[in-house]
Amino acid sequence: MSSDIIMAGLGRPFTLGFLYDARREKLIPGFSLFGDETLQKYATSTPQHSSDFQIVASDSVESKSNVMDIEASLGVSFLGGLVEVGGSAKYLNNTKKYQNQSRVTLQYKVTTTFKQFKAPPGKVNVQQTAISDKNVATHVVTAILFGANAFFVFDSDKVEDSNLQDIQGKMEAVIKKIPSVSIEGSGSVQLTDEEKSLASNLSCKFHGDFLLESLPTTFEEAVMTYQKLPELVGEEASDGVPMKVWLVPLTRFYSKADLLVRDISQGLVRKVHSILEDLHKLKRRANDSLEDDTVKLFPLLEKKLKNFQKNYSDYMTTFRRTISQKLQSIRKGDEDETAMLQLFEDRLRSPFNIDSLNMWMEITEREINVLRSCIDIIEETKHKAVLSQSQMVKDLLDSEVMHAVCYVFTYVTDKDHYLDALRDYLKSPNSRPARVRPVVTWVASNTVLETMREKAHLFRSLAKDMENRCVHFLVASIVNLKVEGAAIHYYRESVLIEPNFKHPIISAVEKIVDRRDLLWYDCELTLDPNTSHPSLYLSEGNKKAVTGTLRAFDNNPERFGLWQQVLCNKGLSRRHYWEVEWNGYVIVGVTYSSIGRKNIDIQSFIGFSETSWTLMFIPKNGVAVKGARRSVSYYFISDLAFPPLGLYHDCHASTLSFYKVSDNVLNHFHTIEIKPKLSEPVYAIIRIGDEDRPYHGTVRLL
C-alpha cells in the first residue's frame, strides 16, 4: 500500500534524505539515505515566499488540524500520542480549560524556501548500513517546504453561558483588527471604548517558530509582536522550519525495505476525532465546576470532582495508548480496522461510555446549582462558611461565641458508587460486567430542594440584620443522610441544644433567670457624642461616661443643653438586651429620639417626661422605676454594691424589663408596660448626676 506522503512538519527536524517510519510516525534522525556528494548533486533550493493570516474561532481538534494542514492519518497519530510536536505545533496541545470560555486564535504563516531531491530512482547509490535491518523505516524525505507559523491564542475569562456567543463575536471583531496595523510598528489598533475594555481582559498564549525576546501575554503585547514577525523571517531555509514534508516509499530506492501495508479510513479518523472531542468537552465541564466558588465551600464535593478528573485522566492515558497500539498494528498489517472499532465498542460497554460520563456531570452540575441556590439566599446575611467539622468545632469553642446558629448541608459527600466503578474498571478492565450508570441522587428530588430552600430562608430571617456579638451564624456541611438535605442547628456555648432550630423560645420576662437566654438579643451600644451634655465626659470608645466640669460646647441641635443626658447610637425596634455598670446618681432607660434637647420643661427630663421609661438609682435611697403616666415604683436595696444592671426591651410587646445580673444568673425586679404601644424605634438614654445638686456618677456600657 506504500505510496507518497505529504505531511505537516509539526516542529520535527526533517532533512532531505532522512528516513521515516510511517507506521510509528517516527523520524529516524542522524542518518541520510543519500551521501553528502549525492545530495549536493541532486538537491535544489527554490525561493517560495508567501505570507498569510487567518482568524480561528473554533478550538476543536478538527479545526486545528485544518489550520496546520495536518492530513487525517497524521492527525489520528497525534491524538494517539505517536507524534511529539514542537515549535508552533504545540498549539495543538493548547485546549480551552473551561467550557464557558471564549477563545479566538490569530494565525500568521510565512513560507521561504522549497528544497527537494530530484534524482530519479536507480540513478543514485544509497547507503544501506542503517536500512539493512528489518522494520526500521518505510519512507524517505525527498522535499521540504520551509517557513514559520505563529499562533496567538486569546482567551476570555469564564463567562455566563448566556453571554458566551456574544463575547465570542466581539472577540473575533477585535482580533481581526490586529493584521490591519502598520507593519512598521508605529501603528496601533483602533478600538472603541467597549472593545478596549474587552481587549484588556484577554489573556494571550503564543506558539510560534519565531525566536522572540519575550512572549506576549496581553492583547497589547500581541499587537507589538505581530508587527515584528516579518522582520524575524529571512529568505533562506535556515531562517525557517520544515512546514510541509514530502516522503516517498523507501522501496523506490531499496527494494527490501518495509512497507506501510495499510492506513486507516476517513470514517475511522472522524470517529476518533468525535470521541476525543467529546472527552475534551467533558474535561472542560469538570474544570468549570472545580473553579466554581460554590464548590470551594464544600471540600467533599471538591474532592469528588478531583477524583473524577483523576479517573478521567488515567483513562485518557490508557485510551490514547491503546489507539496508538492499534494504529501501528493496522499499518503493519497485523490487524484491520475492526480492531479499532472493537476498541470503541468495548468503551461503550464500560463505565467510561460517554453517556454515563455526561450523566454524572449533569447530576454533579445540578448538585452545584442546588447548593448555590441555597447559598445565594443566605449570602446577604452576616455568616461564616466553615470548610470542615473541625473548623466548626473550633469556631464554636471561641470564648466570644455564646450562641451559634448553623445552616448544615447534610447530603454533600465524596462517596459515589459510579466513581468507585470507574476506579475499579481502571484497575481491572476485564473484571467488570456491563456498563455502569451513575445513580440519580437527591438532587433530582424537588421535595429535598424545597426543604433546603425553606431552611435557607429561615436561616436568613434569623441572621439578617442581626448585629449581636454573642450570636454567630455559620454555614457548614456535615454528612447526615438521616436528615433531608439541610438542617439548622442551634448551639449554646458549643453544645448542640436543638438540631432542628426554628426560632428562639423566650420565657415570660419575670421568669427569665438564665442570662444566656437574653444574650441572644444582646445589643452592643455606644454613647452618641453629638448628643452628650457638655459636663459629661465620654471615654473607652464612647462606652463610658462620667460627670465633670461644664465645658464650652458647640450649637449642635442634637446636643442636650440643660440636663446631663446622652443618647445611645442606635434605634431599638425589635428585642434588645444590654447591660450597664453604674455608680452614683444615674438614670437609665429608653425614650423617643424626639425628646427635647434645649427645653427647660419637664418633657426633656428623662424619668419625668411622658415619652421616657426609666430606672433611677440614688445612692443611700434605692431605685425608682418610672413607667406610664409618670407613675413611679420604688425599690429599696440594702446592698449598695449594686451588680450590673440588665435591660431587656421588647418592642413588639412594648415592655422594658430590669434585672440584677450576677454571672449568668438574672434577678428580675420590674417590668414597665409601655402604653400606648410604641409607635417608633426608641433609643437607650442615660442621665448622670445633677448640676444643680452635688450629685455625680459614672456609667459604663458593657
From Swiss-Prot:
Q: In which tissues is it expressed?
A: Expressed by the venom gland.
Stretches for region Thioredoxin (THX) domain: 386-513
Residues carrying covalently attached carbohydrate according to the record: N93, N100, N201, N287, N311, N530
Entry-linked PROSITE patterns: B302_SPRY
Where found?
Secreted
Show the SMART domains listed in the entry: PRY (SM00589)
Q: Which UniProt keywords apply?
A: Cytolysis, Disulfide bond, Glycoprotein, Hemolysis, Hemostasis impairing toxin, Myotoxin, Neurotoxin, Platelet aggregation activating toxin, Secreted, Toxin
Q: Where is this region: Structural MACPF/CDC pore-forming domain?
A: 2-265
Instruction: Report the main location listed first in the record.
Output: secreted
Q: Which family does it belong to?
A: Belongs to the SNTX/VTX toxin family.
The chain positions of domain B30.2/SPRY read 505-702
Q: Where is this region: Structural FAT domain?
A: 266-385
Organism equals Scorpaena plumieri (Spotted scorpionfish)
Q: A GO term (biological process) for this protein?
A: killing of cells of another organism
The record's function comment reads: This heterodimer induces potent hemolytic activities (when tested on rabbit erythrocytes, EC(50)=25-56 ng/mL) due to its ability to form pores in the cell membrane. The pore may be composed of 10 alpha/beta heterodimers. The toxin shows cardiovascular effects that include a vasorelaxant action that may involve the L-arginine-nitric oxid synthase pathway. In addition, it displays edema-inducing activities, increases vascular permeability. It also shows myotoxic activities and interferes irreversibly with neuromuscular function.
The protein's matches in PANTHER family, at most eight in alphabetical order, are given as: AIG1-TYPE G DOMAIN-CONTAINING PROTEIN (PTHR31594), SI:CH211-281L24.3 (PTHR31594:SF16)
What InterPro entries has UniProt attached to this entry? B30.2/SPRY (IPR001870), B30.2/SPRY_sf (IPR043136), ConA-like_dom_sf (IPR013320), Cytolytic_pore-forming_toxin (IPR052090), PRY (IPR006574), SNTX_MACPF/CDC-like_dom (IPR056072), Stonustoxin-like_helical (IPR048997), Thioredoxin_11 (IPR040581)
Task: Reproduce the UniProt comment on modification after translation.
Answer: Intrachain disulfide bonds may be present in the heterodimer.
Task: Note the Pfam families from the entry.
Answer: MACPF_SNTX, PRY, Stonustoxin_helical, Thioredoxin_11
On subunit structure and binding partners, the annotation says: Heterodimer of alpha and beta subunits; non-covalently linked. Also associates into tetramers or even higher aggregates.
Please state what the protein is called.
Cytolytic toxin-alpha
Can you tell which superkingdom this protein's organism belongs to? Eukaryota
